[in-house]
Amino acid sequence: MRDEVAEKEKADINVTLVFQGYENTPIMVCVDGIVFSKPDLVTCLEQRKKPWSMKHPGLTQHNIVHTGDKPYKCKDCGKIFKWSSNLTIHQRIHSGEKPYKCEECGKAFKQSSKLNEHMRAHTGEKFYKCEECGKAFKHPSGLTLHKRIHTGENPYKFEECDKAFYWVLSFTKHMIIHRGEKPYKYQECGKAFKWSSNLTIHKRIHTGEKPCKCEECGKACKQSLGLTIQKRIHTEEKPYKCEECGSSNLTIYKKIHAGEKPYNCEKCGKAFYCSSNLIQNNIVHAEEKHYKCQECGKAFKKSLDLNVHKIIHSGEKPYRYEECGKITHSGEESYKCEECGKGFYCSSSLTKHMIVHTEEKLYKCEECGKAFKWSSELTIHQRIRTEEKPYKCEECVRVFKHSSKLNEHKRNHTGEKPYKCEACGKAF
């Protein structure tokens, strides 16, 4: 009898201890990896039963967290998920369904959370503020990335070159550069790209689409970057200024002052400050001619050469700028020099022109020490020593030291006469 009383008192003490532990817990309680509602748990303990012998609606869902089970499988690709909601979102990739639509602009999304994030673009709300510097962000991911600037954290490390990144997208892009993959291919011309964004922009060369339109002057651009640059012409904004020389072309001039040329050609070993210059150089080596004239079938390596060729068929006589070869139909010189007022059709020409007003000669020949204001002058100077003639005529295989001489020579084949006498109308 005494043993029974002692056993009961011991059980009462255990239950009391359990109640003391759970009296401040929320309505759902997790014990040894299993979830119980608090009222059911209390009832169970009062009856001296083991809690984990009970069942409750919702326990199965929570227990997946502990078991790692993925019971929801996609019929299209076989991918498995823990939650039915994740499977539903995933299936929209296959179906293309975007049920969440923005009432402001009509843009649609697969997930409601993405719509909520997008809405901040219209409202301008920035809920997420950095405690270090006070900068605010629309999305928590933006704040997380920004904080790494202060902490110096670079969690994404590439093992092949030990380079580390604070952003997973930068890491992914860097990995693709190492692997040399070009998964995005355009079926029309066969050209392949590393990034889907580059493929989208390239498609617009073929379609002529220019979706980014300036509200100020109506000028249309193929990509948003062009529109941003165009807007700065109207606002006269120059957000990026070089501390060394005051030039607004910050990235390029930083590399010029540092002597850094990170873009190397694998064919000829030439190095460049800008990736765009490397691309132009690669076209010289390439045999492919992706740009084809629909009128006569003639193909060209550069889109610019195709545009110039089209003028022969159209009879159009637009304004062509000699320095960069770009064509404008308005003749408007949008880029003005603040020093002398001279106008230019393109920003790169204005940047080059600004060196005229400085005495600085950044480009030095390593062989003889002679310095030049322009990289093109140094290149031409170096060809005197090497006798290199990289510009080859595709029609008759004549070679030239300078691209301008090749362009002049091409007119013998095309019959183009861009220089017209205003007095008699004769063209040359």
UniProtKB/Swiss-Prot annotation:
Q: Which GO terms describe its biological process?
A: regulation of transcription by RNA polymerase II
Q: By its UniProt entry, which InterPro entries does this protein fall under? A: KRAB (IPR001909), Znf_C2H2_sf (IPR036236), Znf_C2H2_type (IPR013087)
Of the GO CC terms on this record, one is: nucleus
Listed GO MF terms: DNA-binding transcription factor activity, RNA polymerase II-specific; RNA polymerase II cis-regulatory region sequence-specific DNA binding; zinc ion binding
Instruction: Tell me which residues make up the KRAB domain.
Output: 1-64
The record's subcellular location field reads: Nucleus
Coiled coil (residue ranges): none
Give UniProt keywords alphabetically: DNA-binding, Metal-binding, Nucleus, Repeat, Transcription, Transcription regulation, Zinc, Zinc-finger
From which residue to which do the C2H2-type zinc fingers run? 72-94, 100-122, 128-150, 156-178, 184-206, 212-234, 263-285, 291-313, 335-357, 363-385, 391-413
PROSITE patterns from the UniProt entry: KRAB, ZINC_FINGER_C2H2_1, ZINC_FINGER_C2H2_2
What is the annotated role of this protein in its UniProt record?
Answer: May be involved in transcriptional regulation.
Protein family per UniProt: Belongs to the krueppel C2H2-type zinc-finger protein family.
What protein name is recorded for this chain?
Answer: Putative zinc finger protein 355P
Q: Specify the species.
A: Homo sapiens
